[in-house]
């Protein structure tokens, strides 16, 4: 058993990949800057490149220059770079893993294996780690969602990993769970009686969850074209946001208490059928248009590869109306929306509260505006509450204005630099805390519901509705919510 107070060896498989360069290395540098890395912690890049420590250090430095968004501090870099090691290793050659063992044996650190590679490589990596006893506790393994492309493939991947690692060793990352606003949602809901007692179908009218992007497929067309927005975003992020928004009160803040409640929500999701699927699930695909005052191509023209024909059935946008069939949420519609090439980058949860049963201001207002709570996840983490307030006047006549109570994280906590989601998740993995990570049954229940939804779409196929880049998706998305008497929060 390794000493809990020792440092960590973070072994990154896929050391020169996009995830490592864009997210992991900048986050680790920030943890160094904040003095959060243990003294003896090392960062060991693994890849087939014929590199040594010096070459890898130069590669890391260039990556930080490109993705850090701030000037590298020489003293921090000196300390950070001293942690770097590189292991030239082909994961398809079992005997190559002895090279990694030689590096690992140099100290008494706890091992954290980060598989920043495609899921089809996980089996070979786990087999190699077992061959050098790097699958034994307290060793941990981090893997990125989405896992698989269906329930069947997800089970297959989880079985491969589960053959070598126990569930308490496996950390499945959904980076949205590392966002401050998502974590604060638990505190917001369960520590404030103002919302604790009103978070149900008696007081909440409907809920909207939007995750929008201005970018297109950004060179990921080989992956995205076979997956689409439902598998890439709804299964991966939106269902996690939905479960945290709607879960019942856990008995405590223990990781399994929280995840048990999320699982109950996933089990309560109402499935679609072939008769209502196209009424409640709207698919779209962007055509050419204007984003940030620049012309952009249509989805079908995204690739310059003449040998590859983009799929006209692949959705780049989806909106859906979901119901949760339990006592707390029965009858409350949840509108989910996510897409590419939309007008702005935005992730938010919008809670609309019911109006009072008796309108005493009916003489001047036939209907009252609904109170609205907006939890903004990105680009600016914030909480806004919209309430009605009397406008000051000399007369006794009531003029009501919709005013905003605004809380912005960065403005309120001026002296605290908000951490990137990956910083928090990496630090939690080092502590061995799994509450911000996804349990196996969560992943598989999400895939079960997604598979059922996709099966209905396949049984009643239709091409995605087209929408110009720079707009909020197909017209039918607005029609869907307008028919219920609501409008998208834009």
Swiss-Prot record:
InterPro entries according to UniProt: G6P_DH (IPR001282), G6P_DH_AS (IPR019796), G6P_DH_C (IPR022675), G6P_DH_NAD-bd (IPR022674), NAD(P)-bd_dom_sf (IPR036291)
* Disulfide links within the chain: none
Reaction(s) this enzyme catalyzes, per UniProt: D-glucose 6-phosphate + NADP(+) = 6-phospho-D-glucono-1,5-lactone + NADPH + H(+)
Provide GO CC annotations from the record.
cytosol
Q: What does this protein do?
A: Catalyzes the oxidation of glucose 6-phosphate to 6-phosphogluconolactone.
GO biological process assignments: glucose metabolic process; pentose-phosphate shunt, oxidative branch
Which Gene Ontology MF annotations are present?
glucose-6-phosphate dehydrogenase activity; NADP binding
- Pathway involvement? Carbohydrate degradation; pentose phosphate pathway; D-ribulose 5-phosphate from D-glucose 6-phosphate (oxidative stage): step 1/3
Enzyme class, top EC level, equals oxidoreductase
Q: Which residues form a coiled coil?
A: none
Specify whether Transferase is a keyword of the entry. no
Q: What is this protein called?
A: Glucose-6-phosphate 1-dehydrogenase
- Residue positions binding NADP(+): 48, 90-91, 145
Asked if NADP is a keyword of the record, the answer is yes
Q: What is its EC number?
A: 1.1.1.49
Provide the binding site for substrate: 175, 179, 213, 232, 340, 345
Query: What Gene3D superfamilies does the record tag this protein with?
Result: Dihydrodipicolinate Reductase, domain 2, NAD(P)-binding Rossmann-like Domain
The UniProt similarity line reads:
Belongs to the glucose-6-phosphate dehydrogenase family.
The active site of this protein is located at 237 (proton acceptor)
Q: Which gene encodes it?
A: zwf
What does the UniProt keyword field contain? Carbohydrate metabolism, Glucose metabolism, NADP, Oxidoreductase
